[in-house]
Every structure is written in structure tokens, then in C-alpha cells.
Amino acid sequence: MEPLELSIYKRYRNLMDPTWKSGLEVVPRHVRLEEIVDDYDAFCFDGYGTLYNRGDFVYPGAREWFGLLRSRGKHVRLVTNAASNTEAALAADAAARGFDFTAEETVSSGSLAAEFFADAAARGCPVKEVFYIGRPTGVNLLHSFGVEASENPRLPVVAVSSATADDEMYARAVSLLQKPNATLLVLNSDAWAPRIDGTRAPVSGELAERLRLDSGCKDVLYFGKPFSGIFDKLKASLPVDARILMIGDTLGTDVMGARYAGIGSALVIGRNEPTAELAEDELALGVVPDYYLDV
């Protein structure tokens, strides 16, 4: 991992559990999905970097994984930190790539912000506007909460769903976050993400961390993996006794979050977790998956 990336995921770990000591007791083994398909009832996939990437790119073997699970009647879920649209739209995007998740089978980090806005309204301090950094489609998500994107929100609330800020927008966000009682909403907590060509790039979680550091903002709320809210929503969508496996490409979100949630995890190596850095990163974060999933 990049140094800042590792520090971000360590921060996440410490926010979840300052006494984190477990996570290395498992000895992961390399498996193919068909070897463990009978060991779990529900299979939860990360989206970008695990099943697909930008445009119509689909990773080799991903459709075969999905088809196998559908043919066996397994529960499937898309559990994604993509926060630039509603769950219905994210499900439709996945279906267009060959993964026919329904909206009910989709659990996204952005949807969890609904609780923040509801709580603010219940306290008599409704948030109707935010300074928004993200893709244009993200306004659809905000609208589903009854919230507008504004250059000059009445309250100093900044929401980040993707790393799309230019220098002027970044400076404006820092200025807002330096105001009293400012809040930073990190709708997508991914720090780095893989590209189709095999390289990796900083994304929304990295941008949000720089905003936090540069502004000194103390009230920072994180949505999505690895935090418990998204896994609580996932579990609530499944039978109580379901045996659950989280499949993803990121050690610091998919695997660490699954471990904290008490469910199984399988890591796809070499996309968002460089193979050569895997052992060092596992030791640094104090977590390993149950499996390394081979294609």
C-alpha cells in the first residue's frame, strides 16, 4: 500500500476498535469459488475491482462466479462503497454488465447517509444542503434524502463521494470545514482503487483524509466498508442464520470490515492489493482474509 493509504486504513481500524488485536489468527488458503460454494449461504461482492471496472469492463471469471451462485440458489449481494447514485441505479449498472442484482440485493455506502440526515432533522437541525464533491449522478442520491447540492450551504456540511475536486473546489471545502460545527461526510471511504490497466489511483477516501488534515475538522462521519453500518444493513437483508462470505479486492475495507462484522472473507489479490506487498500490509493492518480467491 501507499503510506497515506495504509495510514487511512489504520485510522479506520482504530475508529472501529481502538483495542484491535485480532485478525491474524487465520491461515488463509488459496481456493476457487466452486471449492467453497457449499460452505456459505450468502455471497457478497464488492463491485469495482472485484466484478468490474470502468465502462463495460468485466474481470475474467466474474460472470462465471455469479452464474454459479445463481444456479445454486445462493443469496447474492452487491456490497459497494460506490456512493454516486441510488441503489436502484447501481443495481441497473451492474445488470448492464451481466450481474443481475436487484435493488434489494444491493447495499451501498451512500444509502447509509439517510440516517445522518434523519437524525439531524430529529434534533431540530435539518440539513437541507451540502457542499458536494462527487460525480453529477450523486445529486440523485442526495435528492433521495431531500437534500440539495449547494456552493453555499446554510450549514458547513461537506459530502464526498468521489475524488472529483479541482483546486478551487478543494479550497472551498477546506474553508467550509474550518467553520465551527462543520461536518465532513465521507460517503465513499475507499482510499485507493484499481484501474483497468493494473495501476492504482487515490480516490474519495484519500481526498477526504486530506480535507480532514488540512481543515482540522473534528466531526468526520464515514459510511460504507469497513465500518459496521453497511454490514449491519447487509445482515438485516439476509436470514438470521445465513453463513456469509464477503468477496472483495481491498484488504482495508472488504476484509477488515468483514472480520470486524464476524463474517467470512475472500480477497482477490493483485488488483487493489499488490501481490508483492500483501504480507507486509496484512501485518501492518493486523488482518488476513479466510481465503485468497483464485480466478
Regions found by a protein language model. Name each.
Residues 1-47, 53-56, 60-74, 83-104, ...:
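Asp-based, Mg2+/Mn2+-dependent phosphohydrolase catalytic module
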